[in-house]
């Protein structure tokens, strides 16, 4: 797996508890959504813009014998407006994350972000500070970082 997937999976394992609700922005093949479901998340909403990912996502649900509690939305993450979840995941590129952070204002969720290079950190940190978010955790693997707000 890519380093960012590894970083995100570690945070999913650490933060997702039974009964929680999870939003997976940029869900791709569904690995993070599926893991959250397996950990007992009651509701997982997976949002992915790339329509080519949907069949792969659904195939992975079948392979993992998942029939409920995950909903797939072929949608642009930047138009998503509901952030009322326990956990928000976004393993997506830096430019999208820069636009997403202000949208998270007011959420009580743990927000877990990756797809960020170490060189992106200062920029992302400044955006977080401007939006009154505190970086609670920062993990590094190779050239990549994952942060928890």
Report each predicted region and the residues it spans:
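Conserved SAM/SAH cofactor-binding pocket of Class I
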Residues: 2-77
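S-adenosylmethionine
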Residues: 10, 49-148
């Amino acid at each position: 797996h890519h380093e960012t997937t590894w970083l995100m999976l570690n945070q999913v394992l650490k933060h997702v508890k039974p009964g929680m609700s999870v939003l997976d922005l940029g869900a791709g093949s569904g690995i993070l959504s599926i893991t959250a479901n397996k950990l007992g998340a009651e509701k997982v909403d997976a949002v992915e813009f790339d329509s080519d990912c949907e069949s792969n996502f659904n195939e992975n649900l079948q392979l993992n014998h998942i029939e409920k509690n995950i909903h797939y939305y072929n949608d642009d993450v930047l138009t998503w407006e509901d952030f009322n979840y326990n956990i928000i995941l976004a393993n997506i590129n830096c430019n999208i994350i820069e636009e997403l952070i202000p949208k998270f204002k007011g959420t009580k969720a743990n927000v877990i972000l990756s797809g960020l290079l170490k060189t992106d950190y200062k920029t992302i940190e400044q955006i977080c500070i401007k939006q009154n978010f505190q970086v609670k955790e920062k993990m590094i693997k190779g050239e990549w970082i994952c942060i928890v707000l």
